[in-house]
Amino acid sequence: MQLDHFVIAVSNWERSNAFYKDVLGAELVEQSPGRWAYRFGQQQLNVHGPGVEPGSNVAQIPVQPGNSDLCFVWRGPIEAAVEHLQAHGLAVELGPVSRPGARGGGTSVYFRDPDGSLLELISYE
Protein backbone atom coordinates (compact mmCIF):
# COMPACT_ATOMS: atom_id res chain seq x y z
CA MET A 1 0.00 0.00 0.00
CA GLN A 2 1.12 3.57 -0.61
CA LEU A 3 -0.31 7.06 -0.18
CA ASP A 4 -2.15 8.52 -3.15
CA HIS A 5 -3.03 12.07 -2.14
CA PHE A 6 -3.54 14.54 0.70
CA VAL A 7 -6.05 17.35 1.09
CA ILE A 8 -5.21 20.88 2.14
CA ALA A 9 -7.72 23.63 2.90
CA VAL A 10 -6.91 27.15 1.78
CA SER A 11 -8.56 30.49 2.51
CA ASN A 12 -7.53 32.26 -0.71
CA TRP A 13 -7.22 30.24 -3.91
CA GLU A 14 -5.18 32.76 -5.92
CA ARG A 15 -2.66 33.36 -3.13
CA SER A 16 -2.22 29.64 -2.42
CA ASN A 17 -2.03 28.82 -6.12
CA ALA A 18 0.87 31.23 -6.54
CA PHE A 19 2.62 29.86 -3.44
CA TYR A 20 2.36 26.16 -4.31
CA LYS A 21 3.24 26.72 -7.99
CA ASP A 22 5.95 29.35 -7.67
CA VAL A 23 7.61 28.35 -4.39
CA LEU A 24 7.14 24.57 -4.35
CA GLY A 25 6.97 23.89 -8.11
CA ALA A 26 3.57 22.17 -8.18
CA GLU A 27 1.76 21.41 -11.41
CA LEU A 28 -1.82 22.75 -11.33
CA VAL A 29 -4.29 20.00 -12.32
CA GLU A 30 -8.03 20.45 -12.90
CA GLN A 31 -9.69 17.22 -11.75
CA SER A 32 -13.14 18.29 -12.95
CA PRO A 33 -14.76 21.71 -13.51
CA GLY A 34 -14.02 23.80 -10.42
CA ARG A 35 -12.01 21.06 -8.64
CA TRP A 36 -8.25 21.54 -8.49
CA ALA A 37 -5.16 19.82 -7.20
CA TYR A 38 -1.42 20.42 -7.04
CA ARG A 39 0.67 17.59 -8.43
CA PHE A 40 4.24 16.86 -7.37
CA GLY A 41 5.47 13.99 -9.55
CA GLN A 42 3.26 11.03 -8.64
CA GLN A 43 1.85 12.64 -5.49
CA GLN A 44 -1.12 14.93 -5.40
CA LEU A 45 -2.36 17.59 -3.01
CA ASN A 46 -6.11 18.16 -3.42
CA VAL A 47 -7.33 21.67 -2.59
CA HIS A 48 -10.47 22.63 -0.66
CA GLY A 49 -11.63 26.13 0.20
CA PRO A 50 -13.12 29.32 -1.26
CA GLY A 51 -13.05 29.35 -5.06
CA VAL A 52 -12.80 25.56 -5.27
CA GLU A 53 -15.88 23.40 -5.71
CA PRO A 54 -16.05 20.43 -3.30
CA GLY A 55 -16.16 17.01 -4.94
CA SER A 56 -18.50 15.52 -2.36
CA ASN A 57 -19.72 16.06 1.15
CA VAL A 58 -17.79 13.08 2.53
CA ALA A 59 -15.85 15.11 5.11
CA GLN A 60 -18.31 15.98 7.86
CA ILE A 61 -15.68 18.07 9.68
CA PRO A 62 -13.38 19.47 6.98
CA VAL A 63 -9.80 20.48 7.63
CA GLN A 64 -9.51 24.22 8.24
CA PRO A 65 -6.95 26.46 6.53
CA GLY A 66 -3.68 26.53 8.45
CA ASN A 67 -4.19 23.15 10.17
CA SER A 68 -2.01 21.04 7.89
CA ASP A 69 1.52 19.74 8.41
CA LEU A 70 3.18 18.45 5.22
CA CYS A 71 6.70 17.36 4.31
CA PHE A 72 8.20 17.58 0.81
CA VAL A 73 11.47 15.99 -0.35
CA TRP A 74 14.05 18.57 -1.44
CA ARG A 75 16.38 17.21 -4.11
CA GLY A 76 19.71 18.77 -3.25
CA PRO A 77 21.53 20.07 -0.20
CA ILE A 78 19.30 21.58 2.49
CA GLU A 79 21.30 24.83 2.33
CA ALA A 80 19.95 25.31 -1.21
CA ALA A 81 16.41 24.86 0.15
CA VAL A 82 17.02 27.60 2.72
CA GLU A 83 18.31 29.92 -0.03
CA HIS A 84 15.26 29.09 -2.18
CA LEU A 85 12.83 29.91 0.64
CA GLN A 86 14.64 33.14 1.49
CA ALA A 87 14.60 34.18 -2.19
CA HIS A 88 10.79 33.90 -2.01
CA GLY A 89 10.66 35.98 1.16
CA LEU A 90 9.85 33.05 3.45
CA ALA A 91 11.21 32.73 6.97
CA VAL A 92 12.62 29.42 8.16
CA GLU A 93 11.02 28.68 11.54
CA LEU A 94 13.30 25.78 12.45
CA GLY A 95 16.32 24.19 10.92
CA PRO A 96 18.32 22.86 9.43
CA VAL A 97 17.76 19.97 11.86
CA SER A 98 18.24 16.20 11.65
CA ARG A 99 14.93 14.35 11.27
CA PRO A 100 13.78 10.81 10.50
CA GLY A 101 11.81 10.57 7.27
CA ALA A 102 10.18 7.91 5.13
CA ARG A 103 13.57 7.13 3.50
CA GLY A 104 15.62 7.23 6.71
CA GLY A 105 17.53 10.07 8.30
CA GLY A 106 17.52 13.47 6.64
CA THR A 107 17.96 17.16 7.27
CA SER A 108 14.88 19.39 7.42
CA VAL A 109 13.79 23.01 7.48
CA TYR A 110 10.32 24.20 8.51
CA PHE A 111 8.30 27.16 7.20
CA ARG A 112 4.66 28.23 6.69
CA ASP A 113 2.34 28.53 3.70
CA PRO A 114 0.16 31.66 3.30
CA ASP A 115 -2.56 30.15 5.55
CA GLY A 116 -0.12 29.17 8.30
CA SER A 117 0.12 25.45 7.53
CA LEU A 118 3.43 24.03 8.70
CA LEU A 119 5.56 22.82 5.79
CA GLU A 120 8.81 20.90 5.90
CA LEU A 121 11.48 20.35 3.27
CA ILE A 122 13.66 17.31 3.93
CA SER A 123 16.89 16.49 2.13
CA TYR A 124 18.34 12.99 2.17
CA GLU A 125 21.70 14.15 0.73
Residue ranges and their predicted role:
Residues 56-60:
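Short beta-strand/turn micro-motifs at beta-sheet edges
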